[in-house]
From Swiss-Prot:
It is a single-pass type I membrane protein. The lineage of its organism: Viruses, Riboviria, Orthornavirae, Negarnaviricota, Haploviricotina. Residues 23-547 are virion surface. This is Glycoprotein. The keyword Signal applies. The chain crosses the membrane at residues 548-568. Residues 1-22 form the signal peptide. Homotrimer. Interacts with matrix protein. Residues 569-588 are intravirion. Glycosylated by host. Glycosylation is crucial for glycoprotein export at the cell surface. It comes from the Viruses. It is found in: Virion membrane.
Length: 588
């Protein structure tokens, strides 16, 4: 047993670290391709959203705690889950409410006159929505999606009586139907997002107030998938000093403090840590420190030489702990604290982390090494900024990836300003430059041919020392060649050129071609305003419509009459008195 332990430990002390080549570990047993074009154009890491970030101080405590070999730990077998953010779609109704007053009056001729006064739109009280929601939702299935609007009044006209006039006050509700994406929060609670203001509405509430009210049927929700998906069953170590779980197998570290406990989720009973990790604990075993385990071997050994060697190994491991692991935590904290517009993922003893800034505070976002990220084919690119679409074979999630970065994140989005960017570049006759972390792909003006690749000798993706047991070697699922990427870039540029026009022509035609997308957007905006005005007009009573028409034509008449009158007055010749000779009646 002692000999076996020595055989296992000596390579750690005296073995060589695998060399790092262009951001990935080289397999020494394989021939590595060394052509001029990089083949490892995949992102290396998958990082969370900014709301998963933690302060650097929290990360530092976990990092230093993971370095200790002299403290007792607890090993756990647990199943880690990631959140299945989108779980389906749900039909909702938007309710735009306005106060309304309905009147009845008997004329001198005995006729019953009815009129309505509708005020400007404002949200109705919650109890009004609770009262009318069942009646409105009963008709949901018969209404089409889209811009159709249905009018629902909470009151009827009062009866006409000769004795006096009568009035009633209530609400006019304009209803439209649409479908919104159904999402899940970290605890498995379904919710939707207000498309106008971004408010979160829990499904269990049945309604939500944004710019106007939203309502939906709770009993019609179909179970379209589980809120959680498993990331695998892994072995994690409980670091008692920082009360943190460290899971080297999936490069994840998280708080052991339970923020929420779910007893009946779609995956059974699970815990949610205070930093948002969902997990299920299978078993727990208390394990002594590494140094205590080595000392226990000393008592089992009969040979003095082996006993002495175990003591030396114990001391050597202690020195490695202080000189490598803890110093790495210190240096990494310094690197993370330096602000950068293009931060890189940094591997640490507690997994890979991405430095970021949140609310003026330096934070770190948890990441995981992910060799299952592949570039989608056919190649799909975005030119503003330059992004490539990739997909995770493990989760099915799709991301926009900036090739100058080593990671992907759900926060990265395509802005969609390709036409404007391409036109501005063409006016200056500048080449299009698409940057990768090892170089750049250049397409020269007028962008009607293939590009050229220029290498960037200084470009690299940071990868720290690989001696930590938590850092596993990355192997790529399928190598990607640069020509495959650049063909997709060429195709995208040519598509944008076709929509912009002949930008190589110096005449004004290119200008009008570039303006065409803006003209289309303006036309859509005008059409939207016109449809809104039409809907508003249909909600008015006849008396109000007559008043609006009279005011409109009065204003138009004044606009035409005033300039005309001024022009007529200016056209008349000015009055001048007739000059007559002066006749004196007296002596001269």
């Amino acid at each position: 047993m002692s000999i076996l332990v020595i055989i296992l430990i000596l390579p750690i002390l005296f073995g060589e670290v695998p060399p790092v080549n262009s951001g990935r570990v080289v397999d020494l047993n394989r021939n590595v391709r060394t052509d001029d074009h990089p083949t490892d154009l995949y992102p290396l890491y998958e990082c969370g959203k900014q709301d998963t970030a933690v302060p650097i101080s929290s990360w530092y405590g976990a990092c230093r705690g993971s370095c200790s070999i002299t403290r007792n730990t607890t090993d756990n077998t647990m199943e880690i889950f990631f959140r299945n953010d989108s779980v389906g779609w749900i039909d909702v109704l938007s309710l735009q409410t306005s106060p309304i007053r309905k009147n009845s009056h008997v004329t001198w001729y005995g006729e019953c006159e009815k009129s309505s006064d509708v005020s400007s739109a404002r949200p109705a009280p919650s109890e009004i929505i609770d009262t009318v929601a069942p009646a409105i939702l009963d008709k949901m299935d018969t209404w089409p999606y889209g811009g159709a609007v249905f009018i629902y009044d909470t009151i009827d006209f009062p009866e006409c009586k000769y004795t006096s006039d009568y009035s009633r006050s209530g609400w006019r509700i304009m209803v439209s139907k649409r479908s919104l994406e159904l999402k899940s929060d970290i605890s498995g609670e379904g919710y939707i997002i207000d498309p106008d203001l971004g408010f979160y509405f829990p499904i269990s509430k049945g309604k939500g107030l944004g710019r106007f009210w939203w309502i939906w049927q709770q009993n019609s929700l179909s179970q379209q998938g589980c809120y959680f998906k498993t990331a695998g069953v892994v072995n994690c170590t409980l670091l008692l000093d920082t009360y943190t779980y460290s899971c080297p197998g999936i490069n994840v570290a998280f708080s052991a403090r339970i923020g929420n406990h779910l007893t009946s989720s779609c995956v059974g009973e699970v815990n949610i840590s205070t930093d948002g990790i969902t997990y299920k604990l299978h078993n727990q075993v208390s394990v002594g420190s590494i140094s205590n385990q080595l000392i226990s071997l000393w008592h089992q050994s009969e040979e003095a030489l082996i006993q002495q060697l175990i003591i030396v190994i114990n001391d050597a491991l202690g020195k490695i702990e202080s000189s490598y692991c803890e110093s790495t935590c210190d240096l990494t904290e310094i690197a993370m604290s330096k602000h950068s517009d293009h931060p890189l993922v940094i591997e640490t003893p507690v997994g890979p982390w991405l430095p970021a800034s949140k609310g003026g505070e330096f934070v770190v976002i948890p990441c995981q090494s992910e060799p299952n990220l592949v570039v989608m084919t056919p190649i799909e690119t975005c030119l503003s900024p330059f992004l490539i679409k990739v997909k995770s074979l493990k989760t099915g999630e799709v991301y926009w990836w900036m090739p100058t970065e080593s990671h992907v994140s759900p926060d990265r989005q395509c802005l969609g300003h390709e036409e404007e960017e391409l036109y501005l570049k063409s006016t200056q006759r500048k080449p299009l430059q698409f940057e990768f972390w090892k170089g750049a792909y250049i397409i020269d003006y007028p962008y009607n041919g293939s590009g050229r690749w220029i290498m960037n000798p200084g470009g690299f993706i940071h990868r720290s020392s690989k001696w930590f047991p938590s850092l596993t070697e990355l192997s790529y699922t399928a190598p990607i060649s640069l020509p495959t990427i650049t063909e997709g870039v060429d195709k995208k540029v040519h598509q944008v050129i076709m929509s912009v026009g002949d930008i190589g022509n110096t005449t004004g035609s290119x200008w009008f071609a570039w303006m065409q997308p803006l003209g289309d957007k303006l036309a859509r905006a005008v059409g939207s305003v016109a449809s809104s005005l039409l809907i508003w007009w249909t909600t008015l009573e006849e008396e109000v419509k007559h008043g609006v028409i009279i005011v409109f034509f009065t204003v138009i008449g004044l606009i035409i009459a005033v300039p005309t009158l001024k022009m007529l007055l200016k056209g008349r010749r000015p009055y001048e008195p007739v000059k007559s000779p002066v006749v004196w009646g007296g002596p001269r």
